[in-house]
A protein has these predicted regions:
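Short, Lys/Arg-enriched anionic-surface-contact patches
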Residues: 11-19
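Phosphate/oxyanion-binding loops and surfaces in catalytic or ligand/nucleic-acid-binding neighborhoods
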Residues: 72, 76, 105, 109, ...
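Hydrophobic alpha-helical connector segments
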Residues: 68, 79-112, 151-154
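Short alpha-helical scaffolding segments that buttress acidic/His motifs in well-ordered protein cores
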Residues: 102, 115-119, 158-161, 165
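Helix-turn-helix
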Residues: 19-22, 26, 30-64, 68
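Amphipathic alpha-helical segments used for helix-helix packing
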Residues: 104-132, 173-175
Length: 208
């Protein structure tokens, strides 16, 4: 006897761009609800009403899907930090707001566990889309400054924030507990350090 498909599984003709967009949205939902292990081609296909083979065609592999998701999350972070330099210069509360945006992306947004999953898989080539997104983030922030030394300082600031937010998302709760520190201890520390990167003499240049 014919059994009618459920509405969310109904298949329709979609462009490649639409499939990727819907697939990444579904992957993000799976990441937040069930963790990195749930971000598979089969689960995404089920969520968007496509076969495993069709999803495979658009993302190449489960690792490719996870990498594309990570890259899209970094691009979203770039958009969220669109006017960061001006804010930092005019708003005393901006450093903490910037820290919260970055840390939220790695923690509540799931980027921290996903990055750890990709790295521990050993397939580091899957970080290439992330590399492009991170460089775009640096360029977006550098583009807001007229200081010749801004590129070096921005790269250093992004390095500091990204590594700190990643570590805080993965192991931060346990380390904070060992040291009797509040939940926002690392965010507060980064917020206090971050303004130094806007001052030409705030951070000594790296040794040659």
């Amino acid at each position: 006897m014919y059994k009618q498909a459920r509405p969310h599984q109904k298949r329709r003709k979609r462009s490649g761009a639409e499939v990727r967009e819907e697939g990444l949205a579904a992957a993000r939902g799976l990441l937040l609800d069930r963790g990195p292990a749930a971000v598979t081609l089969a689960n995404v296909g089920q969520a968007i009403g496509m076969s495993h083979a069709n999803v495979l065609h658009h993302f190449g592999s489960a690792a490719g899907l996870q990498s594309a998701l990570m890259g899209s999350m970094v691009r979203d972070l770039t958009d969220a930090l669109g006017n960061v330099v001006e804010l930092m210069k005019t708003d005393a509360a901006a450093p903490r707001a910037v820290a919260d945006r970055v840390f939220d992306a790695f923690d509540k947004g799931g980027a921290g566990p996903l990055a750890a999953w990709i790295i521990l898989s050993g397939d580091v080539e899957q970080l290439d889309p992330v590399r492009a997104a991170v460089r775009a983030l640096v360029e977006a922030i550098v583009g807001q400054s007229t200081d010749e030394a801004a590129p070096d300082r921005v790269r250093a600031a992004v390095l500091m924030m990204a590594v700190s937010a990643f570590g805080d998302a993965v192991i931060g709760p346990h380390v904070r507990d060992m040291l009797d520190q509040p939940d926002d201890a690392m965010r507060d520390l980064i917020a206090r350090i971050l303004p130094l990167f806007l001052i030409p003499t705030g951070i000594p240049p790296a040794a040659p």
